[in-house]
Amino acid sequence: MKRLISIALVLCMAVSMTVFAANTEIFINGEKAGIAEGMGAIVEKQGRTFVPVRFLLEHFKFQVSWQEKEQMVFGMGPEGEIFVMQVGSELLFYKDAQNNEKKVTMDVTPFLNMSEDRTYIPIRFIAEAMGYDVGWDGATETVTLTKK
């Protein structure tokens, strides 16, 4: 009986391990953009490359704030840009410096990693909303973001 329970636990753990740290590298406008130690990691989940929201927004010089009660991330860019997203929602809102608004519906849901206290979002959706072309090289596991 103990053996059966042990096997069942191992199988449950194996099935639930769908999130893992990736060896993926990110280049933004030709420069490597690494996530600082203690600031999260690049994560592969549901066939998408997720990054901590704070990492990417701060790379673009945004001031980032977290609203715990609503579980929302707010970003204010250096030229008045606005970024808003909520954990558990597939909707992302972005307003650029010219006041053009974009509401993007993602095909996967951003998630909160409680152990790291980090909110993760698919890099493609946030980058495209902010006017970047997104490239993927599967052979080198490299994401490239290039400003349009």
Which residue ranges define each predicted feature?
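Primary recognition of N-terminal secretory signal peptides and signal-anchoring hydrophobic helices
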Residues: K2-S6, C12-K148
